[in-house]
Regions:
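Bacterial N-terminal signal peptides that target proteins for export
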Residues: 1-10
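Charged, long alpha-helical assembly modules
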Residues: 191-204
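C-terminal motif of bacterial Sec signal peptides marking the signal peptidase cleavage site
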Residues: 16-19
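Bacterial signal peptide processing site
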Residues: 21-24
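Short acidic, Pro/Gly- and aromatic-enriched capping/linker segments at domain boundaries
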Residues: 47-49, 56-79
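Extended alpha-helical interaction scaffolds
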Residues: 27, 34, 154, 158, ...
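Post-signal peptide N-terminal segment of mature Sec-exported envelope proteins
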Residues: 27-57
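Mature extracellular/secreted ectodomains of secretory-pathway proteins
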Residues: 70-194
Length: 204
């Protein structure tokens, strides 16, 4: 769930639009900036829609940043692959692997939904910033209004994603308990759940 590009675009757009005067070429530049932002957002939304489709059809990578571990993936039907080769799995192991993938897919889907909502809000924020310029609002007023709107729309979705994490952790533990080959990749713990649940810094 990486929404930092949204923040960059919001900040850049708000500053650029607020810097324009509502007369002459300044207003024209602001309008051009809004059109450019709209095109960029359309492209981002297209990529997110494609990513949503891939959640169902493509393998999930299980490897974290630890380069010492071999490449591991989980197929759509719950098969564990190590370096591209299928790991021997019993019916129980495959069932638990599939249950883990289902939980992962739910979390990833929520993350993509956050990105899609953010793309829409980016356009809304840019349009509001342009209106703010026309209304003579200050830079701070425009920025605060944009940030408040983003928090109002995005925060509930982030909370929904966080609420999924306990089930994901439980599924991870259940599979790791019966699948030794998966254990090195089962790195999520209670602290990850708590960090998400207790996060109060909603600076998008």
């Amino acid at each position: 769930m990486n929404i930092s590009p949204l923040r960059v675009m919001l900040c850049a757009g708000a500053v650029a639009l607020a810097a324009c005067q509502p007369v002459g070429n300044g207003l024209a530049q602001a309008q051009q900036g809004l059109e450019k932002a709209s095109a960029q957002m359309d492209s981002a939304k297209g990529e997110l829609v494609e990513a949503q489709k891939k959640l169902v059809t493509e393998n999930f990578s299980l490897k974290d940043d630890d380069s010492r571990l071999p490449k591991a993936e989980l197929t759509p039907d719950g098969q564990l692959l190590i370096e591209g080769k299928p790991v021997a799995m019993s019916a129980e192991q495959k069932t638990l692997g599939l249950a883990y993938r289902t939980q992962m897919q739910g979390v990833a889907s929520d993350g993509i939904a956050i990105g899609m909502e953010g793309a829409k809000l980016g356009i809304d924020a840019a349009a509001s910033a342009l209106k703010g310029v026309l209304a003579g609002k200050s830079d701070d007023e425009i920025s605060q209004q944009a940030e408040a709107t983003v928090k109002q729309k995005i925060k509930p979705r982030v909370e929904q994603l966080c609420a999924r994490l306990p089930a994901l952790l439980q599924a991870q533990r259940a599979w790791a308990a019966v699948q030794p080959e998966f254990r090195p990749y089962a790195t999520m713990d209670e602290s990850d759940v708590k960090d998400c649940m207790n996060k109060q810094d909603w600076n998008f």
